[in-house]
């Protein structure tokens, strides 16, 4: 179940009616940039359902949209938003780290110094511009985000 409060905890509303039911909520990540925007990942381990379930809501959970894009069909564990660019999202799955630079339409498997293993936790260290990734049994990794931010910058186009 996913619940939201808009009055400091005075009352709560359930907001998961537009999501697959009977699935574990593996992560919830509110946007730092847009009020009412929230990301959620679910998994179906209990039912041998390893489908990708990653969603966003822009209206406090009244409606949900899949942002699976071109992701492969695999369980996902955590999603977080970048601290500089709201279009960049990081998704930890059972087989590695995926990054989108367009809000979830197109995802790419991170090809850096990170093994393709289950990722269960992530946090951004804004001062250092690093993504800290916690894996299942393969340690903790620190990824410098400067290159990802550079890739996401608009490029000057030259018309011929």
Question: Where are the language model's segments positioned?
Answer:
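Beta-propeller blade termini and top-face loops
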Residues: 1-160
């Amino acid at each position: 179940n996913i619940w939201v409060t808009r009055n400091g905890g005075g009352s709560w509303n359930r907001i998961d009616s537009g999501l697959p039911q009977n699935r574990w909520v593996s992560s919830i990540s509110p946007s730092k940039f847009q009020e009412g925007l929230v990301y959620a990942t679910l998994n179906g381990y209990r039912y041998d359902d390893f489908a990708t379930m990653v969603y966003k809501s822009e209206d406090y959970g009244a409606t949900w949209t899949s942002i699976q894009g071109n992701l492969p069909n695999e369980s996902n564990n955590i999603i977080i938003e970048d601290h500089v660019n709201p279009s960049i999202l990081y998704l930890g799955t059972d087989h590695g780290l995926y990054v989108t630079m367009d809000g979830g339409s197109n995802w790419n498997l991170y090809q850096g110094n990170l093994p393709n293993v289950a990722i269960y936790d992530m946090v951004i260290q804004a001062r250092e511009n690093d993504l800290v990734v916690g894996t299942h049994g393969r340690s903790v990794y620190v990824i410098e985000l400067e290159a990802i931010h550079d890739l996401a910058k608009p490029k000057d186009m030259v018309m011929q």
